[in-house]
């Protein structure tokens, strides 16, 4: 029989337990996802779906199912962006507003706990992270999906030029600046139009030339192309990393008489906005030279986030060191990484994320359940290369730049190196639709496989 005192103690204990559980739920997660971008949101949904569908105890008899709130997502951004849409924005086919949703709207509270903060530091030896406010969040398993840092400050004078509305310097590589690109393309009637691409790592390495081809086509359609000298300065040794598609791009430049002047191993290092001059460094001999411009589309350098580069998770390049097949950290087995923040040796695109995510999720689930990591990522990535209004080359390839085309079996009459309207509408209409309605809504989009998830052996 309970006494009054024991009842009070019981009730008090229940409140204390509830308080402790509430605090625990907000600071500890079985799975913690760092990043609320394309990779983070997609993979969080897939993790939830996988662990909900396959609920059973692991070999040690431990319940490995995930309950609502046991997956945490850490990201301080207010908005989530469909960044592949910024090329369309720059071409006048969309707007930044159409590529934007509030991040919280993509993180249903009945599944996930959103921590609206940025990460300050990672402590994988202690299974925790620290946010900018100083909050510590611990985890059993960590998924790194933090994206890449766009370093505008590395090019002297670039930020100042972009912030000046009277200076014809633009970029599609930021939600802050992408809407200004198309108006400047419209206003340019003559002179020198320069488009740049930095050396080194870059998210969507085809985008710097996509916007160039779209601008060139716009000027041609509006009968001013003959008045404009169009140049592309790239810090890379080739126009595109895969020879098959690089050759196709060069072929259409020559055969269609587009007359874009392509300069290799020349990197933009400074923008003199008031003088309308761009300073380049030749990467072969280190020499500097200037070029005047009437329109400059500049692509900033990119690098790993500092909190990753300075952590024990990083490889020598500053990205998360992972096994290129399993996406598991090579340093801490309870850590996985996908997307732009990972050291996976493939092009950093959203298409790559769609192929990496189910592999990572299956291997995480297998690891939690004491199984072998049987899913393998083959490096698949894709770059829908806009070459003009109504035209697109659909580049798809694996590790080592080996082409792997979705329509390869139909290549006799559907060559993916030939710009086609069908491919154009995939980029312009279909991909944005499936992104918002499947990929970040419920995680049920698997890239080249469409709505059909891959199946991996369990052993």
From Swiss-Prot:
<feature type="transit peptide" description="Mitochondrion">
    <location>
        <begin position="1"/>
        <end position="24"/>
    </location>
</feature>
<feature type="active site" description="Cysteine persulfide intermediate">
    <location>
        <position position="383"/>
    </location>
</feature>
<feature type="binding site">
    <location>
        <begin position="35"/>
        <end position="39"/>
    </location>
    <ligand>
        <name>FAD</name>
    </ligand>
</feature>
<comment type="function">
    <text>Catalyzes the oxidation of hydrogen sulfide, with the help of a quinone.</text>
</comment>
<dbReference type="GO" id="GO:0048038">
    <property type="term" value="F:quinone binding"/>
</dbReference>
<dbReference type="InterPro" id="IPR015904">
    <property type="entry name" value="Sulphide_quinone_reductase"/>
</dbReference>
<keyword id="KW-0874">Quinone</keyword>
<comment type="similarity">
    <text>Belongs to the SQRD family.</text>
</comment>
<keyword id="KW-0104">Cadmium</keyword>
<keyword id="KW-0809">Transit peptide</keyword>
<dbReference type="GO" id="GO:0005739">
    <property type="term" value="C:mitochondrion"/>
</dbReference>
<dbReference type="GO" id="GO:0046938">
    <property type="term" value="P:phytochelatin biosynthetic process"/>
</dbReference>
<keyword id="KW-0274">FAD</keyword>
<protein>
    <recommendedName>
        <fullName>Sulfide:quinone oxidoreductase, mitochondrial</fullName>
        <ecNumber>1.8.5.-</ecNumber>
    </recommendedName>
</protein>
<dbReference type="GO" id="GO:0071949">
    <property type="term" value="F:FAD binding"/>
</dbReference>
<dbReference type="GO" id="GO:0070221">
    <property type="term" value="P:sulfide oxidation, using sulfide:quinone oxidoreductase"/>
</dbReference>
<keyword id="KW-0496">Mitochondrion</keyword>
<dbReference type="GO" id="GO:0006750">
    <property type="term" value="P:glutathione biosynthetic process"/>
</dbReference>
<dbReference type="GO" id="GO:0071276">
    <property type="term" value="P:cellular response to cadmium ion"/>
</dbReference>
<dbReference type="GO" id="GO:0070224">
    <property type="term" value="F:sulfide:quinone oxidoreductase activity"/>
</dbReference>
<dbReference type="GO" id="GO:0098849">
    <property type="term" value="P:cellular detoxification of cadmium ion"/>
</dbReference>
<feature type="active site" description="Cysteine persulfide intermediate">
    <location>
        <position position="204"/>
    </location>
</feature>
<keyword id="KW-0560">Oxidoreductase</keyword>
<keyword id="KW-0285">Flavoprotein</keyword>
<dbReference type="InterPro" id="IPR036188">
    <property type="entry name" value="FAD/NAD-bd_sf"/>
</dbReference>
């Amino acid at each position: 029989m309970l006494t009054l005192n024991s009842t009070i103690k019981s009730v008090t204990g229940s409140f204390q337990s509830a308080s402790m559980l509430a605090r625990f739920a907000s600071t500890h997660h079985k799975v913690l996802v760092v990043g609320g971008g394309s990779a983070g949101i997609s993979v969080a949904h897939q993790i939830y779906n996988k662990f909900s569908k396959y609920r059973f105890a692991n070999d040690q008899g431990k319940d490995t199912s995930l309950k609502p709130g046991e997956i945490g997502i850490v990201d301080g951004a207010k908005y989530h962006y469909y960044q592949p849409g910024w090329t369309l924005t720059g071409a006048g086919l969309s707007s930044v507003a159409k590529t934007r949703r509030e991040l919280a709207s993509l993180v249903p509270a009945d599944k996930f706990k959103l921590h609206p903060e940025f990460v300050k530091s990672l402590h994988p030896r202690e299974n925790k992270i620290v946010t900018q406010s100083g909050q510590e969040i611990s985890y059993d398993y960590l998924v790194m999906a933090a994206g890449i840092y766009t370093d505008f400050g590395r090019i002297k004078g670039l930020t100042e030029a972009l912030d000046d509305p009277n200076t014809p310097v633009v970029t599609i590589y930021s939600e802050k600046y992408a809407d200004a690109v198309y108006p400047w393309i419209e206003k340019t009637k003559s002179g020198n139009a320069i488009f740049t691409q930095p050396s080194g790592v870059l998210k969507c390495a085809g985008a710097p030339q996509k916007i160039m081809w779209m601008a060139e086509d716009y000027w041609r359609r509006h009968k001013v192309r003959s008045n404009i000298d169009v140049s592309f300065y790239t810090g890379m040794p080739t126009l595109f990393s895969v020879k098959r598609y690089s050759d196709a791009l060069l072929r259409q430049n020559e055969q269609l008489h587009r007359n874009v002047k392509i300069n290799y191993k020349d990197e933009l290092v400074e923008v003199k906005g008031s003088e309308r001059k761009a300073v380049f460094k030749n990467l072969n001999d280190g020499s500097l030279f200037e070029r005047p411009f009437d329109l400059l589309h500049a692509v900033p350098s990119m690098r790993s986030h500092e909190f990753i580069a300075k952590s024990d998770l990083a490889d020598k390049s500053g990205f998360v060191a992972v096994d290129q097949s399993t996406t598991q950290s090579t340093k801490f087995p309870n850590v996985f990484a996908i997307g732009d923040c990972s050291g996976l040796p493939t092009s950093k695109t959203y298409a790559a994320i769609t192929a990496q995510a189910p592999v990572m999720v299956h291997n995480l689930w297998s690891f939690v359940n004491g199984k072998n990591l049987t899913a393998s990522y083959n490096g698949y990535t894709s770059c829908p290369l806009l070459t003009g209004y109504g035209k697109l080359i659909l580049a798809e390839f694996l590790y080592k730049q080996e082409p792997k085309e979705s329509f390869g079996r139909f290549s006799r009459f559907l060559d993916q190196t030939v710009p086609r309207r069908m491919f154009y509408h995939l980029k312009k209409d279909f991909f944005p639709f499936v992104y918002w309605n499947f990929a970040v809504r419920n995680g049920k989009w698997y890239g080249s496989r469409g709505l059909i998830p891959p199946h991996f052996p369990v052993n």
